[in-house]
């Protein structure tokens, strides 16, 4: 029987966090008990090291905090929590938020505009999220705001800016870039054929390599059945980097469900 880490060091003066309830979301159902235990251990440390800051009246309770921490730690389950160094706060709006965006065009003119954002991440600075999209990240649907922003953090460990190439060995970089750009081109071809709304992969992945890595990281964990057969070579690179195989988890979970169904009387 598994010994849950959050029960081992409870004291009479502490209120146990609702980890078992927090784990009961579709995205995490494929994890083994050992993986769940390891994930909770990381998430506990995450909550000790990072500050979750609710904004604009958003109410942050213990269950929400636990689920946010679990999603942050899923991508680094095998990499280690030190991969999430470089920020200390997570700012959480109740819904998508408006920011002032400044950008420079091809001839050097600077433009300012207000845009709606779901999340933001910088190399050194807080991660900004919104609860509506965090809730939508609980399902195994291919969308996951937290994993998207974590992927940007992992990406910037390789240099000053997000490039779509995480911190991997130098001999792997050329192959990674080749497969990533091939995926971007494939996604763009589908968009041109059927349109952004009908594309099977989020069109944002075709915008630049950094966004492609972040979007495909979402699919890696929450819709591996879409990612793996379409980009098998890149899939293997993601498996090697994250040291996880969500497709194998999905197959195991489906086999378990099928076995349970056949043994119901």
UniProtKB/Swiss-Prot annotation:
It is found in: Cytoplasm. InterPro entries: MetalloPept_cat_dom_sf, MtfA_enterob, MtfA_fam, MtfA_N. GO terms for biological process: proteolysis. Zn(2+) binds at residues 111, 148, 152, 211. It comes from the Bacteria. Keywords: Aminopeptidase, Cytoplasm, Hydrolase, Metal-binding, Metalloprotease, Protease, Zinc. Its cofactor is Zn(2+). SUPFAM superfamilies: Metalloproteases ('zincins'), catalytic domain. Interacts with Mlc. Belongs to the MtfA family. NCBIfam families: PRK15410.1. This is Mlc titration factor A. The gene is mtfA.
């Amino acid at each position: 029987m598994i010994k849950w880490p959050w029960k081992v060091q409870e004291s009479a003066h502490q209120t146990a966090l609702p980890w078992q309830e927090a784990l009961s979301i579709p995205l995490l159902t494929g994890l083994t008990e050992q993986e769940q235990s390891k994930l909770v251990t990381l998430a506990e440390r995450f909550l000790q090291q990072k500050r979750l800051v609710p904004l604009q009246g958003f109410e942050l309770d213990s269950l929400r905090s636990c689920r946010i921490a679990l999603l942050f730690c899923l991508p680094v389950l095998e990499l280690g929590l030190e991969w999430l160094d470089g920020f200390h706060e997570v700012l959480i709006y109740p819904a998508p938020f408006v920011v002032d965006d400044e950008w420079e065009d091809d001839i050097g003119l600077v433009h300012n505009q207000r845009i709606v954002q779901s999340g933001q991440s910088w190399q050194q600075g807080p991660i900004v999220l919104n609860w509506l999209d965090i809730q939508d990240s609980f399902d195994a649907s291919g969308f996951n705001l937290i994993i998207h922003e974590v992927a940007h953090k992992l990406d910037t460990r390789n240099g000053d800016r997000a490039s779509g190439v995480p911190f991997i060995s130098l001999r792997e970089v050329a192959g990674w870039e080749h497969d990533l750009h091939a995926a971007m081109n494939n996604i763009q071809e589908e968009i041109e054929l059927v349109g952004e709304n009908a594309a099977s992969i989020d069109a944002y992945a075709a915008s630049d390599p950094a966004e492609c890595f972040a979007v495909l990281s979402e699919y890696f964990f929450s819709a591996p059945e879409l990612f793996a057969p379409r980009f098998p070579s890149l899939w293997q690179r993601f498996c090697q980097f994250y040291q996880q195989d969500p497709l194998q988890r999905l197959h195991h979970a489906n086999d378990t469900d099928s076995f349970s169904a056949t043994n119901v009387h």
